[in-house]
């Protein structure tokens, strides 16, 4: 049991730590959207939101590849226990299957916050957390219709919770339109738009990460 707890903690720390980079970039995308909406530059705000969504998909794919490649080396720095590390890899690899979903959810969270829809953001995240909490014991121990999946069940519960959060954002986006429009016509990469997102987001992320 102790090994399972340690493996869960190690895998969770790794995936959560790497998602911080995406969260900070999305945060400053939020700032830019709010800034350009306030400046009455609707097209630029739409471009930042749409291209931010596309970048979040790319970030999710990159996180999956880089985290999968570096997971074992990272875990060895936390524990020399082979059993713990193998279970942590099981957890981490399954959570990483949902990387794109997680990065999209983070981006939508910041888009809704940028237009003042804080209640939607809070509601979506709470629903995702509650689903995760509810599914954890069911999928870990095999309660009800679920088979006992152990550490894999915890990972899948996390992924399903994140998927639910993203779906709720999408429902709100289409059911109650917000000032920012995510449309294909804004998807064409604009060097100036993308450079603004990274120029603000990356230094801020490094600034927050270096002291720790």
Please state what every model-predicted region is:
Residues 1-8, 40-100, 146-202:
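Short alpha-helical transmembrane segments in multi-pass integral membrane proteins
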Residues 18, 22, 26, 59, ...:
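Alpha-helical transmembrane segments of multipass membrane proteins
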Residues 101-125:
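Membrane-interface junctions at transmembrane-helix termini in multi-pass inner-membrane proteins
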């Amino acid at each position: 049991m102790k090994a399972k707890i340690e493996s869960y903690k190690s895998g969770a720390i790794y995936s959560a730590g790497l998602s911080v980079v995406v969260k900070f970039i999305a945060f400053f995308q939020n700032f830019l959207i709010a800034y350009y909406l306030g400046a009455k530059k609707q097209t630029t705000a739409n471009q930042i939101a749409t291209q931010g969504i596309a970048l979040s998909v790319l970030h999710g794919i990159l996180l999956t590849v880089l985290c999968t490649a570096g997971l074992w080396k990272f875990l060895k720095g936390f524990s020399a226990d082979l059993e713990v590390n193998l279970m942590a890899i099981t957890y981490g690899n399954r959570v990483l299957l949902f990387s794109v979903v997680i990065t999209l959810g983070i981006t939508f969270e910041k888009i809704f916050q940028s237009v003042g829809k804080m209640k939607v953001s809070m509601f979506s995240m709470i629903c995702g957390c509650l689903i995760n909490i509810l599914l954890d014991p069911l999928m870990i121990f095999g309660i009800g219709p679920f088979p006992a999946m152990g550490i894999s069940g915890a990972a899948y519960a996390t992924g399903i919770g994140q998927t639910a959060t993203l779906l709720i954002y999408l429902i709100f986006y289409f059911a109650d339109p917000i000032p920012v429009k995510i449309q294909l016509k804004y998807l064409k990469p604009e060097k100036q738009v993308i450079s603004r997102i990274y120029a603000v987001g990356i230094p801020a992320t490094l600034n927050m990460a270096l002291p720790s």
